[in-house]
Protein backbone atom coordinates (compact mmCIF):
# COMPACT_ATOMS: atom_id res chain seq x y z
CA UNK A 1 0.00 0.00 0.00
CA UNK A 2 1.44 3.36 -1.02
CA UNK A 3 1.98 6.25 1.37
CA UNK A 4 1.06 9.87 0.71
CA UNK A 5 4.00 12.27 0.99
CA UNK A 6 4.48 16.01 0.48
CA UNK A 7 7.24 17.44 -1.69
CA UNK A 8 8.43 21.03 -2.04
CA UNK A 9 11.34 22.76 -3.78
CA UNK A 10 12.66 25.96 -2.26
CA UNK A 11 15.62 28.33 -2.38
CA UNK A 12 17.32 30.75 0.06
CA UNK A 13 15.54 33.79 -1.38
CA UNK A 14 12.28 32.29 -0.07
CA UNK A 15 13.33 32.06 3.59
CA UNK A 16 11.33 35.12 4.59
CA UNK A 17 7.95 33.40 4.36
CA UNK A 18 8.93 29.75 4.41
CA UNK A 19 8.13 29.18 8.08
CA UNK A 20 4.58 30.48 7.66
CA UNK A 21 4.22 28.42 4.51
CA UNK A 22 5.29 25.19 6.22
CA UNK A 23 3.18 25.86 9.30
CA UNK A 24 0.10 26.11 7.09
CA UNK A 25 0.74 22.47 6.12
CA UNK A 26 1.72 20.84 9.44
CA UNK A 27 0.93 20.91 13.17
CA UNK A 28 -2.80 21.28 12.74
CA UNK A 29 -2.56 23.65 9.80
CA UNK A 30 -4.48 21.16 7.65
CA UNK A 31 -7.64 19.13 8.21
CA UNK A 32 -5.79 16.18 6.59
CA UNK A 33 -2.66 15.09 8.45
CA UNK A 34 -2.13 11.56 7.13
CA UNK A 35 0.99 12.14 5.01
CA UNK A 36 4.05 10.17 6.18
CA UNK A 37 6.86 12.46 4.99
CA UNK A 38 7.33 16.10 4.02
CA UNK A 39 10.32 16.43 1.71
CA UNK A 40 11.85 19.89 1.34
CA UNK A 41 14.16 19.78 -1.67
CA UNK A 42 17.06 22.24 -1.85
CA UNK A 43 19.98 22.63 -4.22
CA UNK A 44 23.20 20.79 -3.39
CA UNK A 45 25.40 23.87 -3.96
CA UNK A 46 24.18 26.23 -1.21
CA UNK A 47 26.13 27.93 1.58
CA UNK A 48 26.56 26.12 4.89
CA UNK A 49 24.44 28.76 6.62
CA UNK A 50 21.57 27.96 4.28
CA UNK A 51 21.74 24.26 5.07
CA UNK A 52 21.79 25.06 8.79
CA UNK A 53 18.57 27.03 8.33
CA UNK A 54 16.88 24.20 6.45
CA UNK A 55 17.99 21.53 8.91
CA UNK A 56 16.32 23.47 11.73
CA UNK A 57 13.01 23.15 9.89
CA UNK A 58 12.93 19.51 10.99
CA UNK A 59 12.18 20.74 14.51
CA UNK A 60 8.77 21.94 13.28
CA UNK A 61 7.54 18.43 12.44
CA UNK A 62 9.34 15.10 12.67
CA UNK A 63 8.10 14.11 9.22
CA UNK A 64 10.14 16.86 7.54
CA UNK A 65 13.23 15.71 5.66
CA UNK A 66 15.69 17.98 3.86
CA UNK A 67 16.76 16.57 0.50
CA UNK A 68 19.84 17.96 -1.24
CA UNK A 69 19.26 17.60 -4.97
CA UNK A 70 20.78 18.64 -8.27
CA UNK A 71 20.02 22.35 -8.63
CA UNK A 72 20.10 22.23 -12.42
CA UNK A 73 16.57 20.79 -12.40
CA UNK A 74 15.34 24.10 -10.99
CA UNK A 75 11.57 24.19 -10.33
CA UNK A 76 11.18 20.54 -11.39
CA UNK A 77 12.89 19.63 -8.13
CA UNK A 78 9.50 19.92 -6.44
CA UNK A 79 8.82 16.43 -7.83
CA UNK A 80 11.79 14.85 -9.65
CA UNK A 81 13.93 13.76 -6.64
CA UNK A 82 10.97 12.22 -4.82
CA UNK A 83 9.70 10.46 -7.95
CA UNK A 84 13.03 8.63 -7.91
CA UNK A 85 13.18 7.84 -4.20
CA UNK A 86 9.46 7.20 -3.58
CA UNK A 87 8.27 5.59 -6.80
CA UNK A 88 5.49 3.65 -5.06
CA UNK A 89 4.05 6.61 -3.12
CA UNK A 90 1.44 9.21 -4.00
CA UNK A 91 3.18 12.60 -4.01
CA UNK A 92 1.52 15.93 -3.27
CA UNK A 93 3.55 18.85 -4.59
CA UNK A 94 3.32 22.06 -2.60
CA UNK A 95 4.76 25.47 -3.41
CA UNK A 96 6.84 27.60 -1.07
CA UNK A 97 5.02 30.85 -1.91
CA UNK A 98 1.51 29.94 -0.74
CA UNK A 99 -0.16 30.08 2.67
CA UNK A 100 -2.43 27.07 2.26
CA UNK A 101 -6.09 27.01 3.31
CA UNK A 102 -6.89 24.34 5.89
CA UNK A 103 -8.70 21.96 3.53
CA UNK A 104 -6.18 22.06 0.67
CA UNK A 105 -4.70 18.61 1.28
CA UNK A 106 -7.97 16.99 2.36
CA UNK A 107 -9.67 17.98 -0.90
CA UNK A 108 -6.89 16.40 -2.93
CA UNK A 109 -6.83 13.19 -0.90
CA UNK A 110 -10.61 12.78 -0.88
CA UNK A 111 -10.76 13.03 -4.67
CA UNK A 112 -7.76 10.71 -5.00
CA UNK A 113 -9.54 8.04 -2.95
CA UNK A 114 -12.29 8.04 -5.60
CA UNK A 115 -9.94 8.27 -8.62
CA UNK A 116 -6.70 6.44 -7.86
CA UNK A 117 -5.51 6.54 -11.47
CA UNK A 118 -5.87 10.31 -11.93
CA UNK A 119 -3.72 13.31 -11.08
CA UNK A 120 -5.70 15.60 -8.77
CA UNK A 121 -4.97 19.32 -9.08
CA UNK A 122 -6.23 22.51 -7.48
CA UNK A 123 -5.22 24.61 -10.48
CA UNK A 124 -6.87 24.22 -13.87
CA UNK A 125 -4.85 25.20 -16.92
CA UNK A 126 -6.88 25.01 -20.15
CA UNK A 127 -5.48 23.35 -23.27
CA UNK A 128 -7.14 23.86 -26.65
CA UNK A 129 -6.76 22.20 -30.04
CA UNK A 130 -6.49 24.25 -33.21
CA UNK A 131 -7.76 23.34 -36.68
CA UNK A 132 -4.17 23.10 -37.94
CA UNK A 133 -3.31 20.31 -35.52
CA UNK A 134 -1.58 22.33 -32.81
CA UNK A 135 -1.94 22.00 -29.06
CA UNK A 136 -2.10 25.31 -27.18
CA UNK A 137 -1.35 25.46 -23.47
CA UNK A 138 -3.06 28.41 -21.78
CA UNK A 139 -1.36 29.51 -18.59
CA UNK A 140 -4.14 30.16 -16.11
CA UNK A 141 -2.39 33.22 -14.71
CA UNK A 142 -3.20 34.94 -18.01
CA UNK A 143 -6.91 34.33 -17.38
CA UNK A 144 -8.40 37.38 -15.66
CA UNK A 145 -10.56 35.89 -12.95
CA UNK A 146 -12.58 38.52 -11.12
CA UNK A 147 -12.66 36.25 -8.08
CA UNK A 148 -8.98 36.99 -7.49
CA UNK A 149 -10.01 40.45 -6.42
CA UNK A 150 -11.93 38.90 -3.53
CA UNK A 151 -9.03 37.14 -1.83
CA UNK A 152 -8.73 34.16 -4.16
CA UNK A 153 -5.44 32.66 -5.24
CA UNK A 154 -4.23 30.23 -7.88
CA UNK A 155 -1.90 27.42 -6.82
CA UNK A 156 -0.14 24.47 -8.39
CA UNK A 157 -0.80 22.13 -5.45
CA UNK A 158 -1.38 18.67 -7.01
CA UNK A 159 -1.42 14.98 -6.11
CA UNK A 160 0.44 12.55 -8.38
CA UNK A 161 -0.44 8.85 -7.98
CA UNK A 162 2.36 6.25 -8.13
CA UNK A 163 3.79 5.36 -11.54
CA UNK A 164 1.93 7.95 -13.64
CA UNK A 165 5.24 8.85 -15.32
CA UNK A 166 6.52 5.32 -15.94
CA UNK A 167 8.12 4.96 -19.36
CA UNK A 168 8.13 8.70 -20.12
CA UNK A 169 10.87 11.31 -20.57
CA UNK A 170 10.22 12.85 -17.15
CA UNK A 171 13.82 12.18 -15.97
CA UNK A 172 15.39 13.35 -19.25
CA UNK A 173 17.11 16.58 -18.23
CA UNK A 174 18.11 17.66 -21.75
CA UNK A 175 14.55 17.38 -23.07
CA UNK A 176 13.18 19.15 -20.00
CA UNK A 177 15.52 22.09 -20.61
CA UNK A 178 14.80 22.11 -24.34
CA UNK A 179 11.10 22.35 -23.61
CA UNK A 180 10.88 24.59 -20.52
CA UNK A 181 14.31 26.07 -19.66
CA UNK A 182 13.62 24.71 -16.18
CA UNK A 183 11.01 27.43 -15.56
CA UNK A 184 7.67 25.75 -16.20
CA UNK A 185 7.63 22.47 -14.31
CA UNK A 186 3.86 22.20 -14.76
CA UNK A 187 4.28 22.02 -18.56
CA UNK A 188 6.90 19.30 -18.24
CA UNK A 189 4.76 17.19 -15.91
CA UNK A 190 1.62 17.81 -18.00
CA UNK A 191 3.33 16.68 -21.22
CA UNK A 192 4.70 13.49 -19.72
CA UNK A 193 1.56 12.47 -17.85
CA UNK A 194 -0.61 13.17 -20.91
CA UNK A 195 1.67 11.04 -23.10
CA UNK A 196 0.92 8.27 -20.60
CA UNK A 197 -2.81 8.98 -21.07
CA UNK A 198 -3.22 9.95 -17.43
CA UNK A 199 -6.32 12.02 -16.74
CA UNK A 200 -6.24 15.09 -14.51
CA UNK A 201 -9.12 16.12 -12.27
CA UNK A 202 -9.39 19.75 -11.19
CA UNK A 203 -11.05 20.64 -7.91
CA UNK A 204 -11.84 24.21 -8.97
CA UNK A 205 -10.17 27.18 -10.60
CA UNK A 206 -9.02 28.84 -7.43
CA UNK A 207 -8.40 28.26 -3.76
CA UNK A 208 -10.07 30.43 -1.16
CA UNK A 209 -8.10 31.73 1.77
CA UNK A 210 -9.61 31.46 5.22
CA UNK A 211 -9.75 34.72 7.14
CA UNK A 212 -7.65 37.72 6.30
CA UNK A 213 -4.89 37.22 3.75
CA UNK A 214 -1.67 39.08 4.43
CA UNK A 215 -0.97 41.52 1.64
CA UNK A 216 2.61 40.34 1.15
CA UNK A 217 1.35 36.95 -0.04
CA UNK A 218 -0.06 38.81 -3.07
CA UNK A 219 3.32 40.34 -3.94
CA UNK A 220 3.67 39.63 -7.68
CA UNK A 221 7.42 40.11 -7.51
CA UNK A 222 7.66 37.40 -4.87
CA UNK A 223 5.66 34.74 -6.71
CA UNK A 224 7.60 32.78 -9.33
CA UNK A 225 4.42 31.94 -11.21
CA UNK A 226 4.05 35.61 -12.12
CA UNK A 227 7.69 35.93 -13.13
CA UNK A 228 7.58 32.81 -15.31
CA UNK A 229 4.13 33.35 -16.81
CA UNK A 230 4.79 36.15 -19.25
CA UNK A 231 2.51 35.74 -22.28
CA UNK A 232 5.46 35.85 -24.71
CA UNK A 233 7.09 33.01 -22.77
CA UNK A 234 3.94 30.92 -23.01
CA UNK A 235 3.95 31.34 -26.80
CA UNK A 236 7.55 30.13 -26.88
CA UNK A 237 6.73 27.08 -24.77
CA UNK A 238 3.70 26.25 -26.91
CA UNK A 239 5.95 26.24 -29.97
CA UNK A 240 8.36 23.88 -28.23
CA UNK A 241 5.59 21.58 -27.02
CA UNK A 242 4.32 21.16 -30.57
CA UNK A 243 7.80 20.73 -32.00
CA UNK A 244 8.76 17.97 -29.56
CA UNK A 245 5.48 16.23 -28.72
CA UNK A 246 2.67 17.97 -30.62
CA UNK A 247 1.35 15.14 -32.80
CA UNK A 248 1.26 12.61 -29.96
CA UNK A 249 -0.47 15.06 -27.62
CA UNK A 250 -2.98 16.15 -30.25
CA UNK A 251 -3.95 12.57 -31.03
CA UNK A 252 -4.41 11.70 -27.35
CA UNK A 253 -6.40 14.81 -26.46
CA UNK A 254 -8.58 14.89 -29.58
CA UNK A 255 -9.69 11.29 -29.04
CA UNK A 256 -10.37 11.71 -25.34
CA UNK A 257 -13.95 11.51 -24.09
CA UNK A 258 -14.30 14.31 -21.56
CA UNK A 259 -16.49 14.10 -18.49
CA UNK A 260 -17.97 17.32 -17.19
CA UNK A 261 -17.99 16.89 -13.45
CA UNK A 262 -15.81 19.46 -11.73
CA UNK A 263 -17.27 22.50 -10.04
CA UNK A 264 -16.33 26.17 -10.02
CA UNK A 265 -17.09 28.84 -7.41
CA UNK A 266 -19.09 31.01 -9.79
CA UNK A 267 -20.11 28.93 -12.76
CA UNK A 268 -22.47 31.51 -14.26
CA UNK A 269 -19.90 34.27 -14.22
CA UNK A 270 -17.30 31.98 -15.74
CA UNK A 271 -19.57 30.90 -18.59
CA UNK A 272 -20.31 34.56 -19.28
CA UNK A 273 -16.66 35.53 -19.37
CA UNK A 274 -14.73 32.83 -21.17
CA UNK A 275 -14.91 31.20 -24.54
CA UNK A 276 -12.10 28.75 -23.93
CA UNK A 277 -12.86 27.61 -20.40
CA UNK A 278 -12.31 24.04 -20.65
CA UNK A 279 -9.55 21.66 -21.38
CA UNK A 280 -8.08 20.79 -18.01
CA UNK A 281 -4.70 19.53 -19.17
CA UNK A 282 -5.91 16.45 -21.05
CA UNK A 283 -8.37 15.82 -18.31
CA UNK A 284 -11.87 16.71 -17.32
CA UNK A 285 -13.83 19.82 -17.99
CA UNK A 286 -14.36 22.49 -15.41
CA UNK A 287 -18.05 22.51 -14.63
CA UNK A 288 -20.88 20.38 -13.34
CA UNK A 289 -23.79 20.41 -15.78
CA UNK A 290 -26.18 19.23 -13.08
CA UNK A 291 -25.76 22.55 -11.27
CA UNK A 292 -27.10 24.47 -14.27
CA UNK A 293 -30.61 25.34 -15.31
CA UNK A 294 -31.69 23.93 -18.66
CA UNK A 295 -31.12 27.25 -20.46
CA UNK A 296 -27.63 27.70 -19.02
CA UNK A 297 -26.80 24.06 -19.74
CA UNK A 298 -27.65 24.50 -23.41
CA UNK A 299 -25.68 27.73 -23.55
CA UNK A 300 -22.67 26.01 -21.99
CA UNK A 301 -22.76 23.03 -24.35
CA UNK A 302 -23.17 25.28 -27.39
CA UNK A 303 -20.19 27.36 -26.39
CA UNK A 304 -17.74 24.57 -25.74
CA UNK A 305 -18.76 22.55 -28.81
CA UNK A 306 -18.63 25.64 -31.02
CA UNK A 307 -15.07 26.33 -29.89
CA UNK A 308 -14.08 22.67 -30.23
CA UNK A 309 -13.06 22.44 -26.60
CA UNK A 310 -14.45 18.96 -26.16
CA UNK A 311 -16.38 16.29 -27.97
CA UNK A 312 -19.72 16.24 -26.24
Where are these regions (language model features)?
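N-proximal low-complexity "stem/linker" segments adjacent to membrane-targeting elements
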Residues: 1-24
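Residues at the starts of beta-strands that form the adenosine-phosphate
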Residues: 3, 36-37, 90, 199
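Short beta-strand/turn micro-motifs composed of small residues
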Residues: 8-10, 42-44, 121, 204
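C-terminal catalytic/acceptor-binding lobe
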Residues: 17, 21, 174-311
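Short, acidic, metal-binding catalytic loop of nucleotide-sugar glycosyltransferases
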Residues: 23-35
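Active-site-proximal specificity loops/subdomain of glycosyltransferases
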Residues: 43-88
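Short beta-strand-to-loop acidic/aromatic patch adjacent to the donor-nucleotide binding site
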Residues: 89-97
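Conserved catalytic core of nucleotide-sugar-dependent glycosyltransferases
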Residues: 101-174
Amino acid sequence: MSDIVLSMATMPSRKKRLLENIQSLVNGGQTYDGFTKFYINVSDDLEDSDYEFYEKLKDIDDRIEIVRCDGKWRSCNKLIPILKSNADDAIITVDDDIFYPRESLERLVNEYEKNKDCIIAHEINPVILSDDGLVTYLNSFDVKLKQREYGKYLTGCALFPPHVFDGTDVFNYDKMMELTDGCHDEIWFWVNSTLNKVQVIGLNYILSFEGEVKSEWHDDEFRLCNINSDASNIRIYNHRVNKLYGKELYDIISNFKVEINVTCDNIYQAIEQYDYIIYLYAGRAAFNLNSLTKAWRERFINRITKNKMIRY
